[in-house]
Regions:
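Conserved interdomain hinge at the start of the Helicase C-terminal
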Residues: 324-358
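Conserved pre-motif I regulatory segment
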Residues: 2-41
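A substrate-engagement module of RecA-like helicase motors
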Residues: 3-10, 62-156, 245-248, 252, ...
Length: 488
């Protein structure tokens, strides 16, 4: 791959490459041409998106998929692709594009797979529709399925979330914010929805054995203030198979009734943990494409991904991080007194700064601290001031720019123990070394650094960081890759 070829792509787009960007793009293009699985790590603001797009174009690896955790950033990627003369399409999932999504809720995915022959919209357009994103498809779709019509849209780059099906031939696949692949896929349901599912099951042709098992499971869930949901104590294989059969039959005959059962199906096949709501976790999945480009600003110290080559651009500037060891959110040590200590440190630190992000590890901690936040779990106004609080791994933890001068990580954001155990089994099946430690450490470190990344939008002006939990002391060596540490 010649540097002139890469340089010409930048010149035609009237883009002035940053220091090192041409060389990195050239190397990426070489790896893509040779079919490698690549980790590309560079700081926020370095220009990763343009570099990867230019490398795809230089390598002739088009059409390609670009996978994102949330479609919020899809428009920006499409705009960058357009600057390089590439036509991108931002594809929505069924929940955004299916005409039956509002009626069937999250059971729409299973309905589409099992009962598509019953769908009144299951037709394709006579000609490929021309559109830039799923919103335009919705406006165009008359008498055909908007979701499947997206597979016909002419484009060189398809931008979609990690979980949407991929049926088009592609010469490469890019995974944006690939650090998310160390985390299990999480779904949240309310206890009320689970109770509705149990009620719906009683009015279905279910055996007394299954109904009894579900009622015992529901009593178990209601009795837990916080902790793992021990589904396997109540659900044997016969229960699970019968539930799946009833659910599939209802999808065909009475899909709206099937919708009510979906929370039970999710709970039966996932690993769950209760806080205020039920969090259901499933194993992460790595796309099986080759070439594959994994893009991230925050790679964990050990990346449990099947990577063959790495390109890492070091951070020119690191945030200063203060370690506070007099507090912790560890389950056995957290108390009302500890919550008061966290309130004190938030007030003491936040009064020195215009904007403060507070990242909390769980709903349990959020309940005690959110009254002290100006904004909680909501995108703030553009000119916001005060304290914005969100849970690690929540919607606000990814994809939004929440520029702030101070970030307080109020507790180590570990996964629940039973979820870490499930993740360890998955890592063990992949032959990764020390899977139990990896399943505990990697998601916690990624969630910590991601929380800080939400506030750090200017590479030359990092926020001050407060790591408020004595357990961060265990990770000094790993944290030095991201922060200049200072003990307080």
């Amino acid at each position: 791959m010649s540097e002139e070829r890469v340089r010409k792509i930048f010149e035609e787009a009237e883009l002035a490459p940053r220091v090192g960007q041409l060389e990195v793009t050239e190397k990426l293009a070489e790896f893509i041409e040779s079919g490698k699985r690549i980790l590309f790590a560079a700081p926020t603001g370095w220009g990763k998106t343009i570099a990867v797009l230019a490398a795809l174009k230089a390598a002739g690896a088009i059409p390609a998929y670009w996978l994102v955790r949330a479609l919020d950033i899809g428009e920006r990627i499409a705009e960058d692709a357009a600057r390089l003369g590439m036509f991108a399409y931002v594809a929505g999932g069924r929940e955004k594009t299916c005409p039956l999504a509002e009626q069937l809720g999250d059971s729409i995915h299973d309905f589409c797979k099992i009962a598509r022959h019953k769908c009144p919209h299951a037709r394709l357009p006579p000609e490929p529709p021309v559109a830039k994103d799923w919103r335009e498809i919705l406006k165009l779709a008359k008498g055909y399925c908007p979701y499947y019509a997206q597979d016909m849209v002419p484009s060189e780059l398809v931008i979609q979330n990690y979980h949407r099906r991929r049926v088009r031939p592609a010469r490469a696949c890019v995974v944006d914010e690939a650090h998310n692949l160390v985390e299990p896929h999480e779904k949240v349901i309310t206890i009320a929805r689970l109770a509705e599912a149990a009620s719906a099951l009683r009015h279905s042709p279910a055996s007394s054995h299954l109904v009894s098992a579900v009622e015992k499971l529901l009593r178990h869930v209601v009795s837990i203030a916080e902790g793992p949901v021990l589904t396997s104590l109540y659900f044997d294989e016969d229960c699970y198979n019968e539930l799946r059969r009833i659910y599939a039959e209802l999808l065909i005959e009475e899909p709206e009734r099937a919708r009510a059962l979906r929370p039970l199906v999710d709970l039966a096949q996932g690993t769950a943990y209760i806080e205020e709501e039920i969090h259901i976790f499933k194993e992460p999945q790595l796309p099986r494409y080759r070439p594959l480009v994994l893009v991230t600003a925050t790679p964990p110290p050990v990346l449990p991904l099947e990577v063959e080559v790495e390109l890492r651009i070091p951070q020119a500037v690191k945030p200063k991080a203060v370690l506070l060891s007099h507090v912790t959110t560890a389950f056995s040590q957290y108390s009302k007194r500890m919550a008061t200590e966290y309130k004190k440190l938030i007030l003491d630190w936040a009064k020195r700064y215009k904007r403060t992000l507070v990242v909390v590890p769980s709903e349990r901690v959020a309940r005690d601290l959110r009254a002290w936040a100006t904004h909680y779990e909501t995108a703030p106004p553009k000119d916001w001031e005060g304290v914005l609080m969100f849970r690690a791994r929540s919607r606000l933890s990814e994809g939004l720019d929440l520029k702030a001068e101070l970030v307080i990580v109020a507790g180590c954001p570990y996964l629940p123990p039973n979820v870490s155990e499930q993740l360890a089994r998955y890592y063990r099946s992949k032959g990764l070394p020390d899977p139990a430690k990896l399943a505990i450490d990697a998601p916690m470190l990624v969630a910590t650094v991601q929380g800080v990344g939400r506030a750090w939008r200017d590479p030359s002006a990092p926020p001050t960081v407060v790591l408020a939990d004595w357990r961060f002391e265990r990770y000094k060596e790993e944290l030095k890759a991201y922060f200049d540490l200072e003990e307080h």
